Amino acid sequence: MKITKFLGLSFLLFAFAATSFPDGVHAEDPAAVLDFYGREVQAGASYLIDQEDFRVVNATINPICNSDVILSTGIEGLPVTFSPVINSTDGVIREGTLITVSFDASTCGMAGVTPMWKIGFNSTAKGYIVTTGGVDRLNLFKITKFESDSSFYQLSYCPNSEPFCECPCVPVGANSDKYLAPNVSYADFRFKPDARIEST
């Protein structure tokens, strides 16, 4: 009899908690990142990253071979792919979640060369910039809505993915030499499906 009463009381407490704290029990996924056409950005698909002024994200060297990430004008950009750290059931990239970013391009075959983005020091660019050669799950970024325009997004680097660093994510923009770099002027980005993929 006591066991029956205990089980009944436990059920009532659980039901009360579920109705009193619905957000904790029925947590919703963050909003999906949308591409240029208003469609959900998909993990593993190829996208070109551009700005409202039509500058596009590109690499200093292609094929990727210790290449740096830049904003360029007047030429076709180099597509990237996004991969979530925690795989979602629907394969959608969502706002504010940790991701890796990689150029969708071949590499030169040197040891340790990868198309994945990371932050590295560059004496030519006079500081830390976004470059290639990243390692999965150690070099993380996130995408959030750009403050001034809901149709554009902000890309941020999250140094808390680095060992022994509990630091906030920092926005990525373009420095005076057009290198993508952390903690410089804000940059508003949008994501266009790679036309070469769309046409296949």
From Swiss-Prot:
Pfam families registered for this protein in UniProt: Kunitz_legume
Keywords from the named record: Signal
Signal peptide range in chain numbering: 1-24
Gene Ontology MF, one: endopeptidase inhibitor activity
Cytoplasm is among the record's keywords: no
The keyword Signal appears for this protein: yes
CDD domains referenced in this protein's UniProt entry, alphabetically: beta-trefoil_STI_GWIN3 (cd23380)
Description of what induces expression: By wounding.
InterPro entries reported in the protein's UniProt record: Kunitz_inhibitor_STI-like_sf (IPR011065), Prot_inh_Kunz-lg (IPR002160)
Domain of life where this protein originates: Eukaryota
PANTHER family linked to this entry: KUNITZ TRYPSIN INHIBITOR 2, KUNITZ TRYPSIN INHIBITOR 5
Family in the record: Belongs to the protease inhibitor I3 (leguminous Kunitz-type inhibitor) family.
Protein name as annotated: Wound-responsive protein GWIN3
Lineage of origin: Eukaryota, Viridiplantae, Streptophyta, Embryophyta, Tracheophyta
The encoding gene: GWIN3
